[in-house]
Amino acid sequence: MRNLLGGKGANLAEMNLIGVPVPPGFTITTDVCNEYFEKGKADVVSLLKNDVEKSISHIEGLMGLRFGDAENPLLVSVRSGARASMPGMMDTILNLGLNDKVVVGLAKKTGNERFAYDSYRRFVQMYGDVVLGMKPVNKDDIDPFEAIIDSVKAKRGIVLDNEMNVEELKELVSLFKAAIKERTGEVFPENPVDQLWGAICAVFDSWMNERAILYRKMEGIPQEWGTAVTVMAMVFGNMGNSSATGVCFSRDAATGENRFNGEYLVNAQGEDVVAGIRTPQQITKDGSLRWAKQQGISEEIRAAKFPSMEEAMPEIYGQLNALQDKLEKHYHDMQDMEFTVQEGKLWFLQTRNGKRTGTAMVKIAMDLLHEGEIDEKTAIERCEPNKLDELLHPVFDKDALVKAKVLTRGLPASPGAACGQIVFF
C-alpha cells in the first residue's frame, strides 16, 4: 500500500481503519506521478478528471459541504507523500477553494471574518509560492510575500502576524495578488477547480525540485518511486482560542527516552509551529517546565504566557496522549505526528516513523525490545550502521553538564561534544 499511496497516504488510510480521527480525503497514486513525467500534464489531467471529480463529491457528502460553494464551502489541502519520508523537501497547499466570493461566505458561515481572511491570505501566499513559482530559491533571496507582510506590520506598528486585524488581512490578500500579477504575469485563479489542478500538478512537479533531488541522492531514494498526492478536507487550527496546531513525538528523538513531547500553537495553522514567527508552547507540563528553565523564564510568566497543552487544553491533551500511544504500539516504532484542533475537536494529519539521532536509535530499539514490541532481529535491523558512528564521538559528562553554566544554546551540526573557535555569521 505504501508503494502506491506513499507514506502519508498509506498511514492516513491505516489511521482511519484503526479509529484515529483523520479528515476525509483521497490519494492519487505514485504511478500517476511517473505517468505525469512520461506523458505530460495535459494527458494525465484528462485521465484523472472524472476520478477526481467523483472523489471530491464523496468528500462533499461526508462533510456536508460543497467545493466552490459561496454559502457552504468545502476547502481542501493538497499534500505530497513519497513512500520514503522526505521531511521538508516536498510541497503542501492549504485552504484551497477560497476566492473573493467564497471567503465572504466562509466568514458569514463561521461568524469569524478574521479567520476567513487569515485563511485566504495564507492560501494566496502558498499558491503563489508552490504553484506559481514565487518561493525563494536561495537562502539570501527576498521572499516577496514575507516582505509585504513585514511592510504592512511595520506601517501599522504590529509585531506578530496574529495581531493583524481583518482590514490588514484583506490588504495582504490584495497586495499578494498584485505581486503575483507583477512577478509572474498571471492572474491568481478564482475558479476552485483550476486551483485544484494547479496544486495537484505542482506537487508532482515538486518531486523534481532541487531540494527533493538532492535529498533523494543523499538518502538513496530512487527517482522512479515518485510521489503520491493526498487531497483532504481542511480542518482549521486558526479558528480561535479553542483551536490549535502542533507536532509531537511518542519518544524523545534526541535521547530516545520514553517521553511524549512536542510543540503546539493556539489559533495557528500549518507551518506556523516551525516557521519561527511565534514561540510555540510545549505539549506536556514536564516539557514546558524544562523549556522555561532552559530559557530562564519564571514560573509565573510560563504559566501565564506559555502554558503546556496538558494545562491549557487538558481534555484534548488526554486524547492526544492516548492516541500517540496507540499509534506507537500499532507501528511498533517511535512516531512523529502532526495534528490540528478545530474548535475543541482533535484531528490527526500525519504519522510516520520519526527521525532520530544515533543514540536515540539504539535506545529506542533496545527499549522496544524489552517492552515486547519488537524481536531481537528487528532491533538489530533498526540500528543503521552509518549512524552507529555517532556513538563513538566524545560527549560531555552528564554530571558536569548539570554543574556547568550555560552561556547560550544552539543546534548541533555534528555528533558529540565539540570545542574550538566561535564564528559568528
Where are these regions (language model features)?
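Long, structured protein-protein interaction/assembly regions in large complexes
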Residues: 412-425
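Nucleotide/phosphate-binding sheet-loop regions of phosphoryl- and nucleotidyl-transfer enzymes
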Residues: 1-408
